[in-house]
């Protein structure tokens, strides 16, 4: 019988897992990517709307400073909302579950979609600003909860591949927004409210279909203490009846952590047994955002123009870059279980480091050497490829893998906070760096890529095809502690967690 064959059972991707992955990623991660890019193409039309609306109210147009400030607020509200969403992860996933949080999160997509879609009709740019905060909260929650949910659904030998799927849908969301954002489609005076309002469609589809799929078995067994529901979920996910071995592995994790209860962010920073895990997610998440990925996209249009690309055609080249991003992320899904997480991180950050160094030289010399702009384009594409291989998809996957059930929600809160604050910082600071350093702006990002690469080489272990307990044992040795959570006496000073109730 098939259930007696451990190889088949270990490697099986069932329709339930595949569909749950696609619905969770499309309904949540896709929106993150879509809202990152959707606001770029119609920006001039939206600024005109801001100005005309202001004129209708007070009888005069905004001055340049006030318009720029208002637009900067509009753009920056998205990462600010992402930061707020990250702070909500722990309480929501512990009380509503992983699937329940994703369903609840659709509120933060449908409401802002309506606000943005009807903002022109209502003659209110304030509706757009509020909506950007709300879709930011949606992105902050989804960027943490989707990897957690999929990581807990997946069998260990598919955890890496499924863990990359959220990043794939982020890149697809960016590409779809770039395509819809072509001037011939929706990036025009009539179409921009529709472009912004389309973000609600994936949320509606997720609300309709995700309830038919299982909650995380780990959440059901460890936090809800419902073994029958956990077994039922596992049977649907694995496609066979005998799930006792996996139930026992989850219970082993539960027994190892039972003495400390569920861990808050404050506890997370206090515990010696989690020291290197916490440092690692901070370094990886900061490295992911501070390595210059947003700056590369910010600078790309100027690089394409300097290489002689017609101004009207830059939008198509940008969409082509987005397509490369999607293609390489698809490749990452297939190679992450072959090459491992550590290798892809090292390769990705190394490629980004090299691309930043060469790009600096190319930008400095493009007025002297005629073919240097083409080198700059090659550097942009190389950087996008490198980032899509490792720095973009792997850090969120590792947060799921290097923390056990009790500390995972708090770890995602820390990781998400670092991610969004770093994102916000780059968006705020890079324009000033660009003015001050010009072509040499990317030296800073090259240094960050190099330092992150060195840290990964020295510290980050390979987690491929290991159970959560096996990964934790690696960190027990690194943290030089005798067990999973030896500091039980230290933790008595903290108030008990209510997450298990």
From Swiss-Prot:
GO biological process: cellular response to fructose stimulus; D-glucose import; dehydroascorbic acid transport; fructose import across plasma membrane; fructose transmembrane transport; regulation of systemic arterial blood pressure mediated by a chemical signal; response to fructose
Keyword field: Acetylation, Cell membrane, Glycoprotein, Membrane, Sugar transport, Transmembrane, Transmembrane helix, Transport
A cellular component annotation (GO) from this entry: apical plasma membrane
Compartments in which it is found: Apical cell membrane; Cell membrane; Cell membrane, Sarcolemma
Similarity section: Belongs to the major facilitator superfamily. Sugar transporter (TC 2.A.1.1) family. Glucose transporter subfamily.
Function: Functions as a fructose transporter that has only low activity with other monosaccharides. Can mediate the uptake of deoxyglucose, but with low efficiency. Essential for fructose uptake in the small intestine. Plays a role in the regulation of salt uptake and blood pressure in response to dietary fructose. Required for the development of high blood pressure in response to high dietary fructose intake.
Protein's recorded name: Solute carrier family 2, facilitated glucose transporter member 5
């Amino acid at each position: 019988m098939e259930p007696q064959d451990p190889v088949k059972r270990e490697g099986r991707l069932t329709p339930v897992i595949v569909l749950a992955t696609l619905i969770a990623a499309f309904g949540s991660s896709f929106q993150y990517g879509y809202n990152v890019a959707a606001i770029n193409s119609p920006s001039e039309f939206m600024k005109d709307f801001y100005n005309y609306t202001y004129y209708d109210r007070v009888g005069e147009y905004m001055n340049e400073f006030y318009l720029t400030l208002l637009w900067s607020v509009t753009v920056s509200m998205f990462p600010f909302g992402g930061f707020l969403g990250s702070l909500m992860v722990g309480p929501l996933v512990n009380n509503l579950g992983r699937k329940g949080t994703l369903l609840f999160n659709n509120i933060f997509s449908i409401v802002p979609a309506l606000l943005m879609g009807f903002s022109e009709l209502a003659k209110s740019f304030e509706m757009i600003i509020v909506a950007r905060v709300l879709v930011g909260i949606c992105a902050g929650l989804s960027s943490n909860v989707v990897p957690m949910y999929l990581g807990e659904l997946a069998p260990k030998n598919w955890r890496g591949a499924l863990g990359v799927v959220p990043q794939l849908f982020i890149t697809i969301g960016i590409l779809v927004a770039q395509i819809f954002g072509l001037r011939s489609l929706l990036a025009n005076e009539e179409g921009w409210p529709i472009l912004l309002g389309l973000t609600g469609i994936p949320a509606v589809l997720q609300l309709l279909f995700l309830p038919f799929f299982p909650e995380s078995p780990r959440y059901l067994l460890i936090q809800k203490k419902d073994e029958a529901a956990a077994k039922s979920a596992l049977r649907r996910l694995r496609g066979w009846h005998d799930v006792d071995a996996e139930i026992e592995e989850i219970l082993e994790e539960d027994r190892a952590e039972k003495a400390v209860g569920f861990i808050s962010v404050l506890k997370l920073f206090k515990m010696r047994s989690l020291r290197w895990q916490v440092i690692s997610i901070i370094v990886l998440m900061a490295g992911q955002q501070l390595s210059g990925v947003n700056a590369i996209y910010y600078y790309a249009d100027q690089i394409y123009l300097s290489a002689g690309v017609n101004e009207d055609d830059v939008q198509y080249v940008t969409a082509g870059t987005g397509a490369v991003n999607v293609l390489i992320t698809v490749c990452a899904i297939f190679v992450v279980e072959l090459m491992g997480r550590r290798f892809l991180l090292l390769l990705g950050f190394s490629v980004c480091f090299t691309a930043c160094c060469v790009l600096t030289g190319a930008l400095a010399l493009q007025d002297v050497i005629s073919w240097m702009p083409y080198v700059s384009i090659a550097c942009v594409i190389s950087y996008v490829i490198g980032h899509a291989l490792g720095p973009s998809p792997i850090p969120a996957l590792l947060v799921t893998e290097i923390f056990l059930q009790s500390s995972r929600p708090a770890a995602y809160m820390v990781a998400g906070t670092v991610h969004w604050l770093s994102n916000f910082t780059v968006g705020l600071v890079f324009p000033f760096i660009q003015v001050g350093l010009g072509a040499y702006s990317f030296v800073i990002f090259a240094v960050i890529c190099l330092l992150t690469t060195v840290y990964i080489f020295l510290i980050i272990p390979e987690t491929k095809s290991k159970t959560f307990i096996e990964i934790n044992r690696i960190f027990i040795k690194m943290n030089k502690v005798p067990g999973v959570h030896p500091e039980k006496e230290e933790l008595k000073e903290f108030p008990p967690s209510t997450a298990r109730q």
